[in-house]
Amino acid sequence: MANQSEKIPRATLKRLPLYYRFVNTLKSKGIDRVNSKAISEGLNIDSATIRRDFSYFGELGKKGYGYNIDSLLHFFKNEISENDEIKIAIVGVGNLGKALLTYNFSIHDEMTITEAFDIREEVIGTQIGKVTVSPFEKITDILSHEQIDVVILTTPEEAAQKVADTLVKAGVKGILNFTPSRVQTPSDVQVHHIDLGIELQSLLFFMKNYSHK
């Protein structure tokens, strides 16, 4: 999907993991077929949006039949690299960093945080889950040796851009940024900003304005 993805809306691409998780749940319940209405009800996404999303990827289903679960699983696995083992590093082992290390994508066998970095002496060398915290000064060598190009950023806001610059120089191609800082990177480095405050404000807005009364 390398070239094709450039023509697909970002919102559609961000929904692919949601579709994959939902379809995988249906598979675990022994269901072998699903239609867009059922997916819509399960994910609270308009069925027209689902059909439009799926249309970007060709014929995934048949009118009157719906979608074959095994076919959808195979497709989504390939599209979101769920068949590949992805090693991830985290920078900043504060409360949020520790929580993410403890969780460590427990429902995703293919994604694992394998490295953690911090600058504080009292944190360096400690083990959280199965990961030992390394000094940040060694990050370039370790990322290169472990072939890691995805990093979760949970540093203090004032350190975020400097850390991001170091990650770019180290060859990182994807950053999941939990800091309030809108870090700047070259166009070939993907950054997804996760601001929990903004997400909560958005939730409250939709609760106030769009909830059924």
UniProtKB/Swiss-Prot annotation:
GO terms for CC? cytoplasm
Binding positions for NAD(+)?
92-97
Gene Ontology terms for molecular function: DNA binding; DNA-binding transcription factor activity
Q: Which InterPro entries match?
A: CoA-bd, NAD(P)-bd_dom_sf, Rex_DNA-bd_C_dom, Tscrpt_rep_Rex, WH-like_DNA-bd_sf, WH_DNA-bd_sf
Gene Ontology process terms (BP): negative regulation of DNA-templated transcription; response to redox state
Q: What UniProt keywords apply to this chain's record, in alphabetical order?
A: Cytoplasm, DNA-binding, NAD, Repressor, Transcription, Transcription regulation
Cellular localization per UniProt: Cytoplasm
Highest taxon, organism lineage:
Bacteria
Q: Which residues bind DNA?
A: 18-57
Q: How does it assemble?
A: Homodimer.
What function is annotated for this protein? Modulates transcription in response to changes in cellular NADH/NAD(+) redox state.
Entry's family note? Belongs to the transcriptional regulatory Rex family.
Q: Could you identify this protein by its name?
A: Redox-sensing transcriptional repressor Rex
Organism the protein comes from: Staphylococcus saprophyticus subsp. saprophyticus (strain ATCC 15305 / DSM 20229 / NCIMB 8711 / NCTC 7292 / S-41)
Starting at the broadest rank, the lineage of the source organism is: Bacteria, Bacillati, Bacillota, Bacilli, Bacillales
